[in-house]
């Protein structure tokens, strides 16, 4: 199988434009697209993967939904909630703290090891194994 790893260089709110152009250029069905994105409702360093669903207010996902529909896979990468609710916009845009970077490195390593599971659309198994490996299991 061919796999393309693509990071749009557009603003997040315009992610859908880029994704639509890429799936048209490479002739990829939206059902074969996997989008990774941050999620403040998931603890830092944990993930949840699923096919389809709502944007849950994520502007980048809303843009993608608008341009290619909702029938694609998503991997929601937890960044946790800010200590003060009023600082959500800063939280999602700030760099990770030094102690958080280690968690991000660990989850990235686990994701890379489990890419074949993700490509086979075993979303629950992928989520479970990535998160298990983070707990030292």
Segment roles from a protein language model:
Residues 59:
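Hydrophobic secondary-structure segments that place a key small or acidic residue at a functional site
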Residues 55:
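Conserved TIR/SEFIR loop-to-helix hotspot centered on a Trp-containing motif
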């Amino acid at each position: 199988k061919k796999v393309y790893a693509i990071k749009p260089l557009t603003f997040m709110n315009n992610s859908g434009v880029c994704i639509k152009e890429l799936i048209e250029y490479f002739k990829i069905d939206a059902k074969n697209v996997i989008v990774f994105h941050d999620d403040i409702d998931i603890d830092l360093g944990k993930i949840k993967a699923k096919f389809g669903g709502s944007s849950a207010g994520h502007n980048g996902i809303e843009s993608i939904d608008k341009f290619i529909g909702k029938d694609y896979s998503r991997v929601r990468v937890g960044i946790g909630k800010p200590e003060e609710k009023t600082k959500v916009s800063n939280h999602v845009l700030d760099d990770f703290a030094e102690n958080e970077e280690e968690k991000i490195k660990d989850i990235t390593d686990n994701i890379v090891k489990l890419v074949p599971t993700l490509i086979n659309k075993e979303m629950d198994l992928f989520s479970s194994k990535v998160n298990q490996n983070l707990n030292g299991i």
